[in-house]
Amino acid sequence: MAVQKSKKSRSMRGMRRSHDALTTAALSVDATSGETHLRHNVTAEGFYRGKKVINK
């Protein structure tokens, strides 16, 4: 097993963990259908930027 050469301080532990935070998804509401969707993604009904791009 690997063994550290010296103890890491609380400060170094915190600096390492500073990048571990989770972010919420960026959601948008489509202008045409009023449906909530992820940014830069087609809605479930096939709309993108107010236009129908996928026919079901």
UniProtKB/Swiss-Prot annotation:
List, as start-end ranges, the regions of compositional bias called Basic residues. Answer: 1-16
The UniProt entry's GO CC annotations, sorted and at most eight, read: large ribosomal subunit
* InterPro entries linked to this entry: Ribosomal_bL32 (IPR002677), Ribosomal_bL32_bact (IPR044957), Ribosomal_zn-bd (IPR011332)
Q: In its UniProt record, which GO terms are filed under biological process? A: translation
Keyword Ribosomal protein present in the record's keywords: the answer is: yes
**The keyword Ribonucleoprotein belongs to this UniProt entry's keyword annotation:** yes
- Cited Pfam families: Ribosomal_L32p (PF01783)
Tell me the disulfide pairings in this chain: none
The segments labelled Disordered in the record are: 1-21
Task: Determine the domain of life of the protein's source.
Answer: Bacteria
Keywords recorded for this protein, A-Z: Ribonucleoprotein, Ribosomal protein
Molecular functions per Gene Ontology: structural constituent of ribosome
Q: What SUPFAM superfamilies does this protein map onto? A: Zn-binding ribosomal proteins
Question: Mind telling me which NCBIfam families this protein's record contains?
Answer: rpmF_bact
Which protein family is it in?
A: Belongs to the bacterial ribosomal protein bL32 family.
- Which HAMAP family would you find in this protein's record? Ribosomal_bL32
Protein's name according to its UniProt entry: Large ribosomal subunit protein bL32
